[in-house]
Amino acid sequence: EAHGAHFIYHEAFPESAANSGADIVIQSLHKTLPAFTQTGLLHLCTDCVTREMMQKKLSIFQSSSPSYVLIASIEQCIHICNENRGYFQQYYEKLWILREKLEELKYIKLVPTDDIGKLVFSVKDTTISGEELFEILRDNYHLEMEMSELYYVIAMTSVCDTQEGYDRLYQALKEIDSEITKKNTEYLFLENDFHQNKKMLKPEEAATKDRIQIDYDDAKDEIAAEFIFLYPPGIPLVVPGEVIDKYVIDKIRQYEQYNMKVIGLDDHKIYIINR
């Protein structure tokens, strides 16, 4: 529940997994609450896992020298939120006013979400992509969004956001909306269609082989030396040790056509096993 640490502070937010039957819930405080980056909480909600067992497992991965600055930030965050629940009512009211104004945009559409604090903007059927909207907001308006993909941009809000920040976001989107138009779009579907690549090596075996970099157009029937994927959603097109077939090459070309960032692609080149 990375983006759900704030759920318990107002009834307008979704029910927290911690109150919905989950055994263990991990929340990132820094994503939606006033806490330093890297701070989070692990909740044991049932007796499925004992505290002793959890401490034993965590000791394998956790540092023996924790940051007391981050620990203090967590404690301060919890104190502020518990003692000032009225802030969340103000947050809720400002969000609804902002959402009502955003609904008036002509081309950029505000997509309904369960969490009103998550603003999802659709640019389907418009003359810009989600990636382009993301870059315009960053470069021209100094507004940092959470993420983007071909047709969408997500803005994460928090109880710490100011009215000035909401006004800047609305004015920026209003200006951009006035400069774009509607267009007929041939949609690129990104759903996983369960294409099965031929496996020649295990990933750990591929990692030990010599590799070379070639143009992906010339990589048909070669063996991949690195993961190639689009993020989001992060599902690999090909895994190290798998054969690169026509499907993979066509998908990479399709993603490039829409100016989407393909991880594992470097200036039209990819790494393959040197055979």
Where are these regions (language model features)?
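Conserved PLP-enzyme active-site core in the AAT-like
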Residues: 1-109
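Short amphipathic alpha-helical patches
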Residues: 81, 160-164, 275
